[in-house]
Amino acid sequence: MSISEIVLIGIALSMDAFAVCIASSMVYTNMTGLRKLSMPILFGLFQGIMPILGFFLGSLFASFIEKWSGLISLLILGIIGINMIREGLAKDEETEPKKLTLWILLVQAVATSIDAFAVGVSFAANSANIWQSAPIIAVTTFVLSLIALFVGTKAGEKLGDKAEILGGIILIIIGIKSLF
């Protein structure tokens, strides 16, 4: 498999992380420094680790992942999205800015990287070089998530209070898309 093919796979895999990063950075407007950078780092890290896990553990979990990955992603992202919409609609003037916790970041990173596990399974079936592929996928996701962070921050500044509702809707749409 060529490097350009791996980069294209990395771009495809990172689209969910890209959208979640935009949605989160619109909502969690008080992030600074390391907290902001932790989002692309974790998303890239998980997108790089999951193909490795899929490569080596795929034969054990392949049928489960193929059958349930879309539903798992929908449930995780749907719950987070519904909660964001609910909080956005109930927001009053004295509400403190939402804080992006490590738990939320980890849940988002796992939810957006489940499909990378399945890609790892296919890499094993095709005898692809996982040690070349995983870092390329991780870096691609990191770079695109970093771009999404800036896009989402600017959009959040412009949208103000509506950003949380829009962010929740985006997460729900990504969850629904994962079913297909």
PLM segments and residue spans:
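C-terminal ends of transmembrane helices
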Residues: C21-L34, I82-E94, S145-K162
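Alpha-helical multi-pass membrane helix bundles of inner-membrane/thylakoid proteins
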Residues: N83-A111
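Hydrophobic alpha-helical transmembrane segments in multi-pass integral membrane proteins
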Residues: I52-F56, A111-A124, I172-F180
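Selective transmembrane alpha-helices of multi-pass membrane proteins
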Residues: S63-L89, L159-F180
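A small-residue-rich subset of transmembrane alpha-helices
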Residues: L34-A62, S127-E157
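Short helical (or helix-break) motifs at transmembrane helix termini and adjacent helical loops
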Residues: L13-S24, E87, T112-V119
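Structural signature of hydrophobic alpha-helical transmembrane segments
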Residues: S2-F18, K67-L77, N129-V143
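Juxtamembrane transmembrane-helix termini in multi-pass membrane transport proteins
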Residues: S4-G58, A124
